[in-house]
């Protein structure tokens, strides 16, 4: 059987094109499984996985937990708000205490960029990065590309624009890496204040006019404004942001072609996207949610296969 070139999923930048292809092919199989009447397989009955979330999460945490249980893994859920971390315990001490319970794999979300990489150098378990600060969110990028592949047949050659708060988004960076590996053309669009200074060095096009960006693309991935990561004001008002960078039905109908709309969630309806767009036939937002379980099953299964060797 083919295997991943890595022992951890720390970021898309550590993967190659073959890794992504293998994850997608494995996800194809698991997507068929989760659409059966009996949605569970016994693949990981001997594997224990700890979900460590040091930042709040609903969708990603539930998706990982469901993926793990669909694979029959034993699951341990950890919340930093109810732990010794609040008492000053270090990350390594926390994880080593959990690993002493014979945990094989750790899924971790952490506010500090590089936390997963740091942890992988100090513990023996396989690490999956479920988001590290504003750095990377690899499984989100994988499920986004997988959803594009499912809808358009292939990612290569497709034009994808990522719209919104690029500066604070781990989803944007992981998507740029993943789409680039697969041969897509990538553009970022948003207010200048929310575009990283050297973003063009990553090989992406940069646009501040939303209409031009949407007329260029095949797919628009809409990002929310991450107010919780902002300590200053990056634009005059939410109303002005919506006027310049919000997508509504009238704007979509004015384009020179029909495009696909995506969103990693959570959606701020009426800000970056209106309800009639989010719920339209051009939207594949719910497909992304469903595909997230299959992709995470694939990643967990492939990494667990390396543990068992």
What are these regions (language model features)?
Residues 54-66, 150-224, 228:
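Glycine-rich phosphate/diphosphate-binding loop of Rossmann-like nucleotide-binding domains
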Residues 44-49, 156-160, 258:
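Phosphate-coordination loops involved in phosphoryl transfer and adenosine-cofactor binding
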Residues 199-276:
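Rossmann-like adenosine-cofactor binding region
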Residues 125, 183-185, 254-260:
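A short helix->loop->beta-strand "cap" motif at the edges of active sites that frequently abuts
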Residues 258-259, 264-309:
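Adenosine-phosphate binding glycine-rich loop
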Residues 1-66:
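Positively charged, low-complexity intrinsically disordered leader regions
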Residues 38-146, 269:
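Phosphate/diphosphate ligand-binding glycine-rich loop within oxidoreductases
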């Amino acid at each position: 059987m083919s295997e991943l070139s890595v022992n951890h999923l720390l970021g898309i930048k550590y993967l190659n094109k073959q890794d992504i292809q293998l994850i997608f092919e494995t996800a194809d199989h698991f997507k068929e499984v989760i659409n059966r009447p009996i949605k569970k397989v016994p693949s990981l009955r001997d594997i224990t996985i700890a979900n460590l979330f040091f930042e709040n999460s609903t969708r990603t945490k539930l998706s990982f937990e469901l993926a793990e249980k669909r694979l029959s893994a034993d699951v341990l859920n950890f919340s930093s708000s109810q732990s010794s971390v609040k008492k000053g315990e270090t990350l390594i001490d926390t994880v080593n205490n959990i690993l002493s319970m014979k945990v094989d794999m750790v899924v971790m979300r952490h506010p500090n960029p590089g936390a997963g990489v740091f942890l992988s150098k100090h513990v023996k378990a396989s690490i999956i990065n479920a988001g590290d600060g504003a750095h990377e969110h690899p499984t989100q990028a994988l499920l986004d590309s997988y959803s594009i592949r499912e809808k358009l047949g292939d990612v290569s050659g497709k034009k994808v624009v990522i719209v919104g708060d690029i500066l604070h988004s781990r989803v944007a960076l992981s998507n740029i890496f993943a789409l680039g590996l697969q041969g897509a053309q990538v553009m970022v669009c948003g207010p200048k204040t929310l575009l990283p200074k050297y973003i063009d060095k990553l090989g992406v096009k940069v646009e501040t006019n939303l209409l031009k960006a949407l007329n260029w693309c095949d797919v628009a991935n809409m990002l929310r404004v991450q107010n919780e990561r902002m300590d200053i004001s990056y634009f005059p008002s939410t109303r002005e942001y919506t006027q310049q960078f919000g997508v509504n039905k009238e704007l979509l109908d004015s384009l020179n072609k029909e495009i696909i709309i995506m969103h990693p969630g959570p959606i701020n309806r009426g800000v970056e996207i209106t309800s009639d767009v989010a719920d339209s036939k051009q939207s594949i937002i719910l497909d992304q949610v469903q595909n997230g379980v299959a992709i995470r099953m694939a990643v967990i299964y492939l990494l667990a296969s390396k543990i068992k060797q």
